[in-house]
Amino acid sequence: LLFPSSAAAPGEFPDQWIHGSKSAMDNTDPPVQVHRYNDHTYILRENKAINYEGAFMYVFFGNGVALLIDQGSTSSPALFPLREVVDELIANWEAEFDQSSTHLIVANSHLHGDHYAAWNQFVDRENTTMVGLTHEEVMHYWGFSNYPDERLEFDLGGRNFVITGTPGHQSS
């Protein structure tokens, strides 16, 4: 697969995100909303009836590799089956684009619990790299030596990303 790097990847946002219900018992929405932004990018949303944060997560695909950014606010696979959803996305993407054995990288935008609660669902997954849950592990994985001033290029199977530190409410 070829991924042009000269421009942003075009895509479509949904008309509406699920919002859950006042009570999880009355909720009829799926625990994870899956939106295909484009052929190789998915935006996931945690149902707000499961956790008020309603976390967003992202899955990016490149040749032979996928990157999951963030794992939501709920650790329980029974309530929030994120790994099941991600595994199904990978299987469907592989079938559509004649790929196999896609390696998964599990990373976080920053290290707050509402972004990595379902991390535990992936720790025993084969063919998976867990970037880490400490500032030091994250800096080492991406290769930062002058964070946050440095901008690094990351090759996700022929799909190039720029990794950079940004001001926010968490150091990594």
List where the protein language model places each region.
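N-terminal low-complexity, Pro/Thr/Ser-rich intrinsically disordered segments
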Residues: 2-27
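Short, flexible coil/linker elements and helix-boundary hinge sites characteristic
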Residues: 3-4, 31, 98, 143
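Generic structural motif
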Residues: 4, 32-34, 41, 104, ...
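Intrinsically disordered, low-complexity boundary segments flanking structured domains
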Residues: 28-33, 150
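Conserved beta-strand hairpin/beta-sheet module of binuclear metal-dependent hydrolase folds
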Residues: 31-93
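Hydrophobic residues at beta-strand termini and immediately following loops
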Residues: 44, 148, 166
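Active-site HxH/HxHxD metal-binding segment of metal-dependent hydrolases
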Residues: 74-163
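Active-site-proximal loop/helix segments of hydrolase catalytic cores
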Residues: 167-172
